[in-house]
Each structure stands twice: as C-alpha cells, then as structure tokens.
Regions:
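N-terminal secretory signal peptides that target proteins for export/translocation
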Residues: 1-14
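N-terminal secretory/targeting leader peptides
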Residues: 19, 37-130, 139-343
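C-terminal segment of classical bacterial N-terminal signal peptides
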Residues: 19-20, 25-35
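An acidic, glycine-rich surface segment that forms the CoA-thioester-binding/catalytic face
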Residues: 136
Length: 343
C-alpha cells in the first residue's frame, strides 16, 4: 500500500503552526513537578477560631498543599465551629461525608477509641519535650484507630499547656469548690467534680454562651484557647496548673487521599510533615505571646499555681488515669508508663 504525501494546503500549514507553537510552549514552560490531575478540594473543619493553634494548622496545611500541587488540590476550611461539628463528632462527620477531614481536639475523641484520651490525661506530661516524644510513640496507635474508621492521619498539633480561666483567683483547694467550670473531655470533668467543682464537658463555643448567661464562672483551656476567644471579657484570672499538654489530630478520609495520583499523595504527605514541624515550632514563643496579650487585656496570670491546688487536682486525677489504663492496649500503657518516668 502506498501513501500520497500531504498536500501543502492552507489547512495543513495551520496544523503545522499549531503543532510547532505547542512544542515551543512545552519547552519554555516545562513540565510541573506534579502532573496535572482533576481539580480536587477537601472540606476541612475545626471547632476553634482561625487564630487558634488548631486553625493556624489548617491554614498552613491548606496553603502548603495547594502550593505543592500547583493548585490542583485545595482545602476549604471552616473555622470556629462554623459547621456545628464539635471535635467529638468530627470523625463521624467525615465518615458521613459532611466533611472530608479536619482538626479535632483529641480528648473528646476518646468516645471513639480510648487511645485518643492519652494526651489529656491529668498531669501525665509536664514538658514540651515529653509531649513531643509521647506523640511520636503514640502515632502508630492514632493511625491504627483512624484507619479502622476509613480515615488517615495527616499531622499532630501539640497545644500549649492547660490552665483554668476563672472570675476569681484560685488560692486554695476550697476555691475550686466555688467553680462552675467547662471542661474539655470526660476525664477533666471527672477530675473537677472530684475536687468539689460543678463541671460540664462542653465544646468551647457552647461554654462561652453559658459564660455570657452567668451559668459558668470558669473554663478549663489553654491560654491559646482563651486568647482566641477573648475570654478576658468575662474571666480575669488564669491559673497555669499545667493540667495537660494535649494534642489535636488532623485527618482526612482515606478514600479522598487514595483518589489522588501517587505524585499528589507524596505532596500531601510532605505538606502534612511540614505543617506538623511548623506547628511545634510555634510553641517556642506561643505561651509568652499569649500571656502578653492576656496581661494587656487585664488578665491576672496567677503563677506559679498554689501547690495545694495542684496537689488536690493531682489526687483527683488518679481515678480517671486508672480507668483509662484498664481499657487500653499494652502498647498504650507502655507509653503512659514512659511518660510517668519522664516528668
């Protein structure tokens, strides 16, 4: 079979021009490090404000992953409980496809798996170095707990240490009995009740509403949580009891991650690692910056916390710690024992 050569018709010349131009553009522009794929957007949520450390993490991750993938993957972040999804409900919300993922404070997730209560056990961790090591040792356990629910761990955020915001100073254990306090998980509610306080576990936005209605006079949270919510409008004392150095966990649905091409998956992993690193670096100055803002807004930071107050709270913390040990794996208990030896 013989083929006739192409005639130099006007249409043929146009084809050649288009082809030549396309080749030139490809050579000039070059190929992106991540091949283009169908645009994807992950809807992510947190119950905390954008300026809170949880919100900062979502912002950092979103910007980094968008940059890494040349805008092919972006995040749509909902802050300050905009979607009415508390940390306790967040795993289920992702499974139900209301969100793709988010950043959840870990303590309330204990209702899904007890391992998530590790970082907020009372007085278990007393330094950032210990908190970082505990998070690293527990990471495979967090990953496993999420994986069984079709979810993937992205990064861990370590929070500033927990204290008590109150309308009156806490000078002795008797002052604890006068508190109507919001706590951030079931264990902390049990501890506060054991010292005589009226305690209720609530998402922070619900607690602030009750604070405005004078149904609460204290909130258990970090300086970071309080600054982001401007708790100084109602509570003028902060006692840094160092109750815990807790974490929040950022995650996404595994099927969303699996739908990405391998190159994009690698960039997501890189963005998550970079976010976790930058979140930890924030802690170096975060507490000092928070305290400066608190003092400038009339908050008395009553440090050091009275030893008798700490002793009463530590004694009350023994029961929830024992209960937690009874329902977790040997691997989890080993992490707790290690932390106790490195106070």
């Amino acid at each position: 079979m013989h083929f006739q050569p192409t005639r130099n018709t006007p249409l043929a010349w146009i084809d050649r021009i288009v082809f030549t131009t396309a080749c030139a553009v490809a050579l000039v522009v070059g190929e992106p490090s991540v091949p283009a794929f169908a645009q994807a957007q992950w809807k992510m949520a947190t119950e905390y404000p954008q300026s809170n450390i949880s919100g900062v993490g979502l912002e950092t991750f979103g910007k980094t992953v968008s940059s890494n993938t040349h805008g092919s993957l972006t995040t749509l972040n909902a802050f300050d409980n905009e979607m009415k999804i508390s940390s306790r409900e967040m795993l289920r919300a992702a499974q139900d496809h209301r969100i793709d993922g988010g950043d959840a404070f870990a303590g309330p997730l204990e209702s899904s798996d007890p391992i998530f209560g590790l970082s907020s056990l009372p007085f278990m961790v007393q330094s950032l170095d210990t908190a970082k090591e505990v998070a690293a040792r527990a990471r495979p356990l967090y990953e496993r707990a999420l994986s069984t629910r079709g979810l993937k761990l992205l990064y861990i955020t370590i929070w500033p240490s927990t204290g008590i915001w109150s309308d009156q100073p806490l000078k002795n254990p008797e002052d604890l009995r006068a508190l109507s306090v919001r706590t951030y998980d079931g264990n902390s509610a049990e501890v506060m009740r054991a010292v005589g306080a009226t305690a209720e576990y609530l998402p922070l936005n619900e607690a602030i509403a009750k604070l405005k209605e004078h149904k609460l006079n204290a909130i258990l949270t970090s300086g970071d949580g309080g600054v982001a919510r401007q708790l100084w409008d109602d509570l003028h004392h902060f006692t840094p009891i160092n109750y815990a150095i807790p974490i929040s966990i950022a995650f996404v649905r595994q099927d969303d991650f699996d739908a990405l091409p391998k190159e994009a998956q690698d960039e997501v992993e890189a963005a998550a690692a970079e976010t976790e690193k930058s979140q930890f670096e924030l802690l170096a100055n975060r507490t000092a910056e928070n305290y400066k803002r608190m003092r400038s807004n009339g908050v008395s930071i009553d440090e050091p916390a009275p030893p008798a107050v700490i002793a009463a709270l530590k004694k009350a913390g023994s029961s929830p710690i024992a209960a937690w040990r009874a329902k977790v794996s040997a691997d989890a208990i080993a992490i707790l024992d290690w932390a106790n030896q490195h106070q």
